[in-house]
Amino acid sequence: MTSEIHCDSLWYGADIVTMRDGKYHTLSNGAIATRDGKIVWLGEYDALPATLTADERVKFDGGIITPGFIDCHTHLVFGGNRSAEFEQRLNGVSYAEIAAQGGGIISTVKATRDADEERLLEQALFRLRPLLAEGVTCVEIKSGYGLTPESEMKMLRVARRLGELLPVEVKTTCLAAHALPPEYANRADDYIDLVCNTIIPQAAAAGLADAVDAFCEHLAFSPAQVARVFAAAEAAGLPVKLHAEQLSALGGSELAAQHHALSADHLEYATEQDARAMGDAGTVAVLLPGAYYLLRETQCPPVDLFRKHNVAMAIASDANPGTSPALSLRLMINMACTLFRLTPEEALAGVTTHAAKALGLQASHGTLETGKVADFIHWPLSRPAELAYWLGGQLPCTVIFRGEIRQ
């Protein structure tokens, strides 16, 4: 005997792109039954169980349904912006010259430290809303522009508040090992002491961080210093991720794999050894085409090696004031295809299935399957490849967040 299924809402009248296993796996004329914010039944409409009852039925007029988008790498909370420096760079002023004038990341650190929480919140809301308009239902937000215990906690509190004020799930990452603050010039190990002994334990104790990140690069922190950060994160019970191999090959992504990091991000200079280690560890490669584009880089991430070694590839906006002031995940999907040669199917998996894995959420998010969170998007499109094809326009018809239409 078939048991009765009762749901709050039955959504039907569109093709459902489930993204199970990172593939389209489209259900023609599909239906999704949701209850208490979860998917309780999914399949073709003609296969609806006779025992299924719904409090409401919502019929779409064609189109496609995809999982909600996940932006798994952002720096949305910061003070000010660096549009003046953008103009300077276009006029031939080097990054080193800008930094010598007090610009670069240190200018953002100053603006972030000077801003109170309400001002940071106001600015972050302005940046987050365009992502939500495109169907983002889950977003990761990093700290990393405070670089003191007080300012890092301030950033993380603002990130948490964003998830309370807007209908979006926010995952927070403590990125205190992002840059060397000016007061620690030539004392990087001392600053790492502060990160490991004070900032990470405070963030964990306050419940403000879901993960810990670091920037492993010649202009930031060495693999040995990052290893200390990872040890502190693990002691605090937090998973790790890493900015790695963006500008040079330092072995950061292999280090991340050794620590079973959720993800290693950027990866333009990753090697086959890195890709093999990441594949073995299940570490996701998060590709950030916005930074690649704005910095006019010429070395692409080794996508073929990631495919060869079964490394899941996610895509994110890397929204930040310096190298990727990008507030469109749809544009990142197109850039990943045109610049990095991902297929449209891989790119869609990059903002759904694999983005969920990059945040440790693969059991609950990223695909449309029974038991998972009811976050999905209805698009006025006929094929999922159109999500990578169109530049601008074509916003969602409807975004469903936890089983309810997001207003």
From Swiss-Prot:
CC cofactor note: Binds 1 zinc or iron ion per subunit.
EC number(s) on file: 3.5.2.7
Compartments, record wording: Cytoplasm
Catalysis performed (reactions): 4-imidazolone-5-propanoate + H2O = N-formimidoyl-L-glutamate
Associated pathway: Amino-acid degradation; L-histidine degradation into L-glutamate; N-formimidoyl-L-glutamate from L-histidine: step 3/3
GO molecular function: imidazolonepropionase activity; iron ion binding; zinc ion binding
GO biological process, alphabetically ordered: L-histidine catabolic process to glutamate and formamide; L-histidine catabolic process to glutamate and formate
Pfam families named in the record: Amidohydro_1
Chain residues that bind Zn(2+): 73, 75, 243, 318
Cofactor(s) recorded in Swiss-Prot or TrEMBL: Zn(2+); Fe(3+)
Gene Ontology cellular component list: cytoplasm
Annotated positions binding N-formimidoyl-L-glutamate: 145, 320, 322
Keywords: Cytoplasm, Histidine metabolism, Hydrolase, Iron, Metal-binding, Zinc
Binding site for Fe(3+): 73, 75, 243, 318
Residues annotated to bind 4-imidazolone-5-propanoate: 82, 145, 178, 246, 323
Membership in a protein family: Belongs to the metallo-dependent hydrolases superfamily. HutI family.
Free-text function comment from the UniProt entry: Catalyzes the hydrolytic cleavage of the carbon-nitrogen bond in imidazolone-5-propanoate to yield N-formimidoyl-L-glutamate. It is the third step in the universal histidine degradation pathway.
Protein's name in the database: Imidazolonepropionase
Gene transcribed to yield this protein: hutI
